[in-house]
Amino acid sequence: MTEIDLKLSDGRTLHAYDTGADDADGRLAVFWHHGSPNIGAPPEPLFAAAEELGIRWVSYDRPGYGGSTPRPGRDVASAAADAAAVADALGIDRFAVMGHSSGGSHALACAALLPKRVVGVVVVGGWHLLAPRGSTGSKGSGRVARPTCARRLPGEPH
């Protein structure tokens, strides 16, 4: 796996990872969006299967994580611009996205905001805060989540 520091036009640095830098032709690039508080290193236990399937893992540390500099005012939607910047720097036109835990929302943002570039999306163990509008943080979200899930998913255990 190759690690690179990409300098963006706004002066920030994104620390990126690429398992296919030496053999990119014909391989599907899959952008890995990490959960919190992890860094962006793609899931090494999946490398062998990815190699057999012709998958190239690409990722980056979200702003403020690992080797990436912070992005003031960052929101989930800004992940699309960052992923596009990494793809452009690596010469990747179209790619799939995969997110784990809180990275799931970042993967979904990429799929929604980059529809001409993202060919597929996978979310593994994604989460969504079900706290009431206007609340701060996730304190007490479990109390809110249970009845909300019960209404949205009748018949499921909560």
Give, region by region, the residue ranges found by the protein language model.
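Conserved acidic catalytic loop of the alpha/beta-hydrolase fold
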Residues: 78-96
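Conserved HGGG/HGGXW glycine-rich cap/lid loop of the alpha/beta-hydrolase fold
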Residues: 12-67
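Active-site signature of alpha/beta-hydrolase-fold catalytic machinery across serine-
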Residues: 109-113
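Gly/Ala-rich beta-loop-alpha elbow adjacent to hydrolase catalytic centers
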Residues: 99-103, 107
